[in-house]
């Protein structure tokens, strides 16, 4: 395929030193020999709004801690833009190409096939079976590219039909891959745009010919697509593959944020993006200390499955005493027949006992003392008790989540109060206690919210009682602090406000620290036992 002037990996020994200072990219499928230097020709195509939301100066290249109020300040990370991720990709491709000496876009496809694991690629590359390797990666071996057949005088001078749209075009309007299948430029552009925009495909776009699995290289894509938005989307798809395969990289989960967080080692630790979103690097959810990722994932799934219907189920259904399928009573008759095709049990709605002993007295159930009916009712009660337990923790979890949303709005109110205080002979530094108090309040709300997830899966023991006492103490102090900031801030004198708020937020900080330290100590000493849901 002809090379492109744009999104291109150029290799040139004479310009190696100059190229090292320029931005780099991912390239073509050129047949020329590959040298040492690597250049990204179209980094300028990346719109900051798409690439990362901010220009390069927004990247936290010096690393960072988890943010205010968090305990682990040794977990280093940096926030990267899409341009910087692209440069990391180019460096990875350059490292491999120093050894295998292939066109850069071919190397990119090989690396993608091995999930960007350079060691695995090298091992396979030198195991002596290159033909099999390139076949598995769906590319033509660059050292064995088929010779291009010369066009006859007749075919080169006459219009030819495209095998997709069947319109006639001059031969110069056709292009294709090393597999030899050629189509018109318009069909190529439409095909690639559909694959990228509608199907979300980037690294696995194959030749449009029937039963041809040869992959389209980056240079071909960037040459044949004219819409800059489609090019940006393609670049994002390629970089997404690189990020998803790298255990040290994670996309920021905030909507419309295209930053990537890079860490020195993967762990369930808090990281903060430049957009302000703080999340757990391990699972990508909002930072959720003290509950572990495993239990939070189970909780989120349970809430998604249960929260909207649990109240209705509790009030309107019972379980089949045989197969435990949930059954709704749709008539006045108490003679129930389970509609589970593998069950078909007949039972009494009132006592949940077998229907057969009821005889003709279906309207006047007298089986309450039967052992089998009692066992069925016991099972039903256990199910209801489990549901009530879930609702207990879910309601408190959701309540703290809602309070946290409201208290984020306190910042505007507090800012206004801080300005008023500065007009009453208080310095800017002296009024910072109010912002600090709101910070602590939000941290405590977040911690309390996740303590209910932790408690839901926690088995009762002596340590769990201590945990619940710490939880209750922190919850009470948090509510008092919330009251100070929402009501007393506009009523009390300035000195009274300052003393009350400072004392309470320091106490909240202390109790939050005690609670988290106790939970972490339990993790270290294996003190916690869990209820498998």
From Swiss-Prot:
Gene3D superfamilies: 1.20.120.1750, Zinc/RING finger domain, C3HC4 (zinc finger) (3.30.40.10). Residues 409-425 form a coiled coil. It catalyses: [E2 ubiquitin-conjugating enzyme]-S-ubiquitinyl-L-cysteine + [acceptor protein]-L-lysine = [E2 ubiquitin-conjugating enzyme]-L-cysteine + [acceptor protein]-N(6)-ubiquitinyl-L-lysine. InterPro entries: Ariadne (IPR045840), ARIH1-like_UBL (IPR048962), E3_UB_ligase_RBR (IPR031127), IBR_dom (IPR002867), TRIAD_supradom (IPR044066), Znf_RING (IPR001841), Znf_RING/FYVE/PHD (IPR013083). Pathway: Protein modification; protein ubiquitination. The active site is at 333. Its EC number is 2.3.2.31. Zn(2+) 2 binds at residues 179, 181, 207, 212. GO terms for molecular function: ubiquitin conjugating enzyme binding; ubiquitin protein ligase activity; ubiquitin-protein transferase activity; zinc ion binding. GO terms for biological process: protein ubiquitination; ubiquitin-dependent protein catabolic process. Zn(2+) 6 binds at residues 348, 351, 358, 365. This is E3 ubiquitin-protein ligase arih1l. It comes from Danio rerio (Zebrafish).
């Amino acid at each position: 395929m002809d090379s492109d002037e744009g999104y291109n990996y150029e290799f040139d020994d004479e310009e190696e030193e100059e190229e090292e200072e320029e931005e780099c990219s991912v390239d073509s499928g050129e047949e020329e020999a590959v040298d040492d230097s690597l250049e990204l020709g179209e980094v300028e195509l990346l719109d900051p709004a798409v690439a990362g939301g901010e220009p390069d100066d927004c990247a936290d290249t010096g690393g960072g801690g988890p943010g205010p109020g968090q305990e682990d300040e040794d977990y280093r990370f940096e926030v990267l833009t899409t341009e910087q991720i692209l440069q990391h990709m180019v460096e990875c491709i350059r490292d491999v190409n120093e050894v295998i000496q292939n066109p850069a876009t071919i190397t990119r496809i090989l690396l993608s096939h091995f999930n960007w694991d350079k060691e695995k690629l090298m091992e396979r590359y030198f195991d002596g079976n290159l033909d099999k390797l390139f076949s598995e990666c769906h590319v033509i071996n660059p050292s064995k590219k088929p010779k291009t057949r010369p066009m006859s005088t007749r075919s080169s001078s006459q219009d030819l039909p495209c095998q997709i749209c069947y319109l006639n075009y001059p031969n110069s309007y056709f292009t294709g891959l090393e597999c030899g299948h050629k189509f018109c430029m318009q069909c190529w552009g439409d095909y690639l745009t559909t694959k990228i925009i509608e199907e979300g495909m980037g690294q696995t776009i194959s030749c449009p010919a029937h039963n041809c699995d040869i992959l389209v290289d980056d240079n071909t894509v960037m040459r044949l697509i004219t819409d800059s938005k489609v090019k940006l989307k393609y670049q994002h798809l390629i970089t997404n593959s690189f990020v998803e395969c790298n255990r040290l990289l994670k996309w920021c989960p905030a909507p419309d944020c295209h930053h990537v967080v890079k860490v020195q080692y993967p762990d369930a630790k808090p990281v903060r993006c430049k957009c302000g979103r703080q999340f757990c690097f391990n699972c990508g959810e909002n930072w959720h200390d003290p509950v572990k990722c495993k239990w939070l994932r189970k909780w989120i799934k349970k809430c998604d499955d249960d929260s909207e219907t649990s109240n209705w189920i509790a009030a309107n259904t019972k379980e089949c005493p045989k197969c435990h399928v949930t059954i709704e009573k749709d008539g006045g008759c108490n003679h129930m027949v389970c509609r589970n095709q593998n069950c078909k049990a007949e039972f009494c709605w009132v006592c949940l006992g077998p229907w057969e002993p009821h005889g003709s007295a279906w309207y006047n159930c007298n089986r309450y003392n039967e052992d089998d009916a009692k066992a069925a009712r016991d099972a039903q009660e256990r199910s209801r008790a489990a549901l009530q337990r879930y609702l207990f923790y879910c309601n408190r979890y959701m309540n703290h989540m809602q309070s946290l949303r409201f208290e984020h709005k306190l910042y505007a109110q507090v800012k206004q109060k801080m300005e008023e205080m500065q007009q009453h002979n208080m310095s800017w530094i002296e009024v910072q206690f109010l912002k600090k108090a709101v910070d602590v309040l939000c941290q405590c709300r977040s911690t309390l919210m996740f303590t209910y997830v932790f408690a839901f899966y926690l088995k009762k023991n002596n340590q769990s009682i201590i945990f619940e006492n710490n939880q209750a103490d922190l919850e009470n102090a948090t509510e008092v602090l919330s009251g100070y900031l929402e009501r007393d801030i506009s009523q009390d004198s300035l000195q009274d406000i300052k003393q009350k708020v400072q004392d309470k937020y320091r106490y909240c900080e202390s109790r939050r620290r005690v609670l988290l330290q106790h939970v972490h100590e339990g993790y270290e000493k294996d003190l916690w036992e869990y209820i498998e849901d």
